Amino acid sequence: MFTIGSRVFVCNENALIVRIFGKEFVSLRKCRYIDFFMDIQYLIRLEEKMQNELLRLCTERGALKGVVLETEDINEQWKILAPEYMADAVPEIAKYPTVSVSWAAYLGLAVAYGWDADWETFLKMPYQSYYGEQGFDDMDEHIVRDLLRIPLDSRTAKDMESTIRACGEKIVGLIRFEQIPPQSEMAFHVFAHACKVMFRIGAAIQLKRMGYNFEKVKMGN
């Protein structure tokens, strides 16, 4: 356990400290962050609101069917990829706010595809494997064209891009409505939760595309 200012961290060995917005943050994979002053319930409620709004939007567009399909494996992979994704996305917030959250959905598409295709191989792939020729900037096109094998000029790709862009715009609108001070610690945490929601939505869209469905299982007596 150690502190940075008034903040307290409980970490594993080799924890990575990164600086974002001039503040120090710890790798989500290595540490558990304890903040006695932050309204955790607020973040949980906001995350639920974001996910519900995106679920409604995606269902209206036919990308989902009223449920966010998910697996524990895929959700856990976000925890591994999140620190490096955040390091790429945060600098994009000011100029490209929609991109900064939307690319997490494409990452979700890719991870869900890997979970179905060859999970053991995809688990070993570093975050940078999802980069396009221009790195983070064209990650979206690389994932759609090269991983999912969907031609970028196809109706499927265009519909997917339109839906993810709409989700990103919805998320940005919800964040702005909260009137959180920019570049504050709370703003960082809200952004992190927003990216997690976008990742899950992207994964759910791909799981549906691959034919997975949610089924209730009745347990025997």
Write out the residue ranges for each language-model feature.
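N-terminal amphipathic/basic-hydrophobic helices that include classical n-h-c signal peptides
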Residues: 1-36
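Intrinsic-disorder/low-complexity detector
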Residues: 22-221
